[in-house]
Curated annotation (Swiss-Prot):
It comes from the Bacteria. Keywords: Flavoprotein, FMN, NAD, NADP, Oxidoreductase. GO terms for molecular function: oxidoreductase activity. Transmembrane segments: none annotated. InterPro entries: Nitroreductase (IPR029479), Nitroreductase-like (IPR000415), Nitroreductase_HadB/RutE (IPR050461), RutE-like (IPR023936). Its cofactor is FMN. Gene3D superfamilies: NADH Oxidase (3.40.109.10). This is Putative NADH dehydrogenase/NAD(P)H nitroreductase PST_3601. Pfam families: Nitroreductase. Its EC number is 1.-.-.-. It is an enzyme of class 1 (oxidoreductase). PANTHER family: MALONIC SEMIALDEHYDE REDUCTASE RUTE-RELATED. Belongs to the nitroreductase family. HadB/RutE subfamily. It comes from Stutzerimonas stutzeri (strain A1501).
């Protein structure tokens, strides 16, 4: 059992954290991206499947490849962000299960079941994307998650000939707080939750 984290940590992760669309001209070091992944990879997934794959797009060439895949409303903010993470999932993730979940033959649970593979890969890579957002905030980065892009075009540009498929995008960097709008409302407990 662990003690609750303090209010400052909760503020960093949740109550004071914001979704950013404008970015300061400050690079994110590759070493920080490696540190970020070291935290993300420890988050739980079903049968420790870890199906998410992350492409950290931070070069001009990478952004040029990404740009045609973006919806119009996401183009400028993504090109301005120091890093855009393509959160993908690997449909061959069952092949890693003998290594990642060695105490059971979990790979056999997915044999011949492509729909189950895709369902679990999408669900658990989405979970890992959430870990990435929280880990990034904990490391002093700001985030701007997005789903406005052409998945087929992105997969063709970045993942042709592989078993990887795109799930969502997350812009990373140091947000320009002066460009933030007022926080949007969220649903209260009694409208979003049921005690059963």
């Amino acid at each position: 059992m662990h003690a609750p984290i303090d209010s400052n940590a909760l503020a960093t992760l949740f109550s004071e954290a914001r979704t950013h669309s404008a970015w300061l001209d400050k690079a994110v070091p590759d070493a920080l991206l490696e540190q970020l992944y070291e935290h993300v990879r420890l988050g739980p997934t079903a049968v420790n499947s870890c199906p998410a794959r992350f492409v950290f797009v931070r070069s001009a060439e990478g952004k040029q490849k990404l740009a045609p895949c973006l919806s119009k409303g996401n183009l400028d903010k993504t090109l301005a962000a120091p890093v855009t993470v393509v959160v993908a999932y690997d449909e061959d993730f069952p092949e890693t299960l003998p290594e990642l979940f060695p105490h059971a033959d979990a790979r056999s649970w997915y044999a011949g079941q492509p729909a189950l593979i895709t369902e679990n890969a999408l669900r658990n890579s989405s979970l890992q994307a959430g870990y990435l957002i929280l880990a990034a905030r904990a490391l002093g980065l700001d985030c701007g998650p997005m789903s406005g892009f052409d998945g087929k075009a992105l997969d063709a540009a970045f993942f042709a000939g592989t078993s990887w498929k795109s799930n969502l995008l997350i812009n990373l960097g140091y947000g320009d707080a002066s460009k933030l709008r007022d926080r949007l409302p969220r649903l209260p407990f009694d409208r979003a939750c049921v005690l059963a």
